[in-house]
Swiss-Prot record:
One of its GO terms (cellular component) is plasma membrane. It comes from the Eukaryota. Signal peptide: none annotated. This is Cytochrome c biogenesis protein CcsA. May interact with Ccs1. It comes from Nymphaea alba. Its main location: plastid. Required during biogenesis of c-type cytochromes (cytochrome c6 and cytochrome f) at the step of heme attachment. One of its GO terms (molecular function) is heme binding. GO terms for biological process: cytochrome complex assembly. Pfam families: Cytochrom_C_asm. HAMAP family: CytC_CcsA (MF_01391). It is found in: Plastid, Chloroplast thylakoid membrane. It is a multi-pass membrane protein.
Length: 308
């Protein structure tokens, strides 16, 4: 009872803090206030430790790693987003993820704590097939890979938005120059060039970090799929069964393998590879969320305890 109450308290504290962090981040987009930025970062750190405490508490009183159903996996995914958020902060890197990870964490946790998954808030006894040492290895690797791949994909989507906006601005500016070619203002040209250079630098950094994060996520996804295959062989006598979850995991792996391949070709870097990563964003959600709710197979559990 004490552990359940503690888990309930930590859930609401983390959700409340992160709800305050998001509008704070939005304000920092308009006003560069150092104190405000620092407060929002500390808020995310507090959220990370609250979710960590929540998961540890659930682990203690349930007797198994909290990765057995949709609610627990969503909370772990929210924890993963928070982890990705705070790593650049401690390494003193410019945090390109802050505007992505904070909303991702609150949306994930918000759905997990909503009334739709009320039945899953109480921990259930694991079915025999899940009582394996591979549970933590396989599921944690898959969820960490989803978090990394989603963040990398969102960076690529941001890159595409900036790139296409720049092309529209250039097209509009070109038309303006053709109309007023005899009254061209040199100051406007300098400002226009500076903005383009700044956008170019930003897109380069976004491309670099999306590649790094997706590369990490792809590695974790590969480990997760391989460990799942070994576990499947122990539980069901077959490494691969082509059920919906396995099929979509393979599709996800293939899409991001194509992305990494395009990044090796300089002519396809930037917007071209970002388009592939953007497609991967949708594929991940189908693999993780859609199959769980709508699919049939060995991994399909929807709003109930995982049945294998």
């Amino acid at each position: 009872m004490i552990f359940a109450t503690l888990e309930h308290i930590l859930t609401h504290i983390s959700f409340s803090i992160i709800s305050i962090v998001i509008p704070t981040h939005l304000m920092t987009l308009v006003y560069e206030i150092v104190g405000l930025c620092d407060s929002s970062e500390k808020g995310m750190i507090t959220t990370f430790f609250c979710i960590t405490g929540l998961l540890v508490t659930r682990w203690i009183y349930s007797g198994h790693v909290p990765l057995s159903d949709l609610y627990e996996s969503l909370m772990f995914l929210s924890w993963s987003f928070s982890l990705i958020h705070i790593v650049p902060y401690f390494r003193n890197y410019k945090n390109f993820f802050s505007k992505i990870t904070a909303p991702s964490a609150i949306l994930t946790q918000g759905f997990a704590t909503s009334g739709l998954l009320t039945k899953m808030h109480q921990s259930a006894i694991l079915v025999p097939a899940l009582q394996s040492r591979w549970l933590m290895m396989h599921v944690s690797m898959m969820l960490l890979s989803y978090a990394a791949l989603l963040c990398g994909s969102l960076l690529s989507i941001t890159l595409l938005v900036i790139t296409f906006r720049r092309k529209i601005d250039i097209f509009g500016k070109t038309n303006h120059l053709l109309i007023s070619s005899f009254s061209f203002d040199e100051t406007q040209y300098v400002n226009f060039s500076f903005r383009n250079y700044h956008r170019y630098q930003l897109t380069q950094r976004l491309d670099y970090w999306s590649y790094r994060v997706i590369g990490l996520g792809f590695t974790l996804l590969t480990i997760g799929i391989l460990s799942g295959a070994v576990w499947a062989n122990e539980a069901w006598g077959s490494y691969w069964n082509w059920d919906p979850k396995e099929t979509w995991a393979f599709i996800t792996w293939t899409v991001f393998a194509i992305y990494l391949h395009t990044r090796t070709n300089k002519s396809l870097q930037g917007a071209n590879s970002a388009i592939v990563a953007s497609m991967g964003f949708l594929i991940i959600w189908i693999c993780y969320f859609g199959v769980n709710l709508l699919g049939r197979g060995l991994h399909s559990y929807g709003s109930f305890t995982l049945n294998i």
